[in-house]
């Protein structure tokens, strides 16, 4: 394991990840208390705050919004996902490759 200070997710020895990868897994019910957080643009704007060191998103959100923020936001690419829309075993399928995440500009990978 490499030291935290060598991680692209750390700043001054601290990490604060803005996790926006749960919408796929939990559905829109997670956003009901704060509807503005349903908008990825709002989340990426929030991610530009100095306290936020990275933003975790799924493939589609990264493709659509990260290019406009690549100079201001550290991307943690969540390469797998599941859903609570079915009962039984949750398959956490890989939905994009590490190589593609890197090509898009990801600084780190989440699984």
Give the predicted meaning of each segment.
Residues 15-17, 21-55, 60-111:
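Alpha/beta enzyme core
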Residues 1-12, 16:
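N-terminal basic/disordered segments at the start of proteins
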């Amino acid at each position: 394991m490499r030291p935290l200070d060598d991680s692209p997710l750390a700043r001054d020895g601290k990490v604060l990840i803005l996790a926006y990868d749960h919408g796929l897994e939990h559905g829109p019910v997670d956003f009901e208390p704060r509807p503005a957080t349903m908008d990825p643009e709002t989340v990426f704007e929030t991610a530009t705050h100095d306290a936020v060191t990275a933003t975790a998103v799924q493939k589609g959100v990264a493709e659509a919004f990260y290019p406009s923020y690549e100079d201001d936001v550290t991307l943690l690419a969540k390469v797998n996902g599941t859903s609570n829309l079915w009962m039984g075993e949750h398959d956490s399928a890989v939905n994009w490759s590490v190589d593609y995440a890197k090509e898009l500009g990801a600084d780190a990978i989440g699984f």
